[in-house]
Amino acid sequence: MATQSVSNGAVSNGKKYLSLFLSKEEYGIEILKVREIIGMVDVTPLPRTPQFVKGVINLRGKIIPVVDLRIKFQLASTANTDLTCIIVVQVNHPDKSHTLMALVVDAVEEVVNLTEADIEPTPDFGGAVQADYILGMAKIKGQVKALLDIDAVLHGVEWKK
């Protein structure tokens, strides 16, 4: 898969989200968090890290940690396919610093523009993903998708077992 650059433009009447698949479930992440989408590459494993931390990749001389969201969210394991890819995202920390991290996902689908009317609060009942990891639930083309708060998902990741 060729490297794809993602435009970082917000729309005045809404926000853009990248639609992605994890174990046949569809999620969205804010496009402004996405720095790059690349095909699956070899990941160098790191010792003594949680199972969801796959290791690191070297992206043009920068070492970036790789997290498998399927494992982090305790979703069904799926084999990598030609559509499996890595999304490089910028994670913002409470101290205003930021880190680049890479996410293994089953596939990316499209970028959609959502207005506030398209997004509803996260319900209080249990689900595959912790409620504090979700910005809201979006209605897209007749389907409901969870919009992930990547900062919450990846901030404070326990790197050691």
Segments predicted by a language model, with ranges:
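An acidic, low-aromatic, low-complexity terminal/linker signal
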Residues: M1-K161
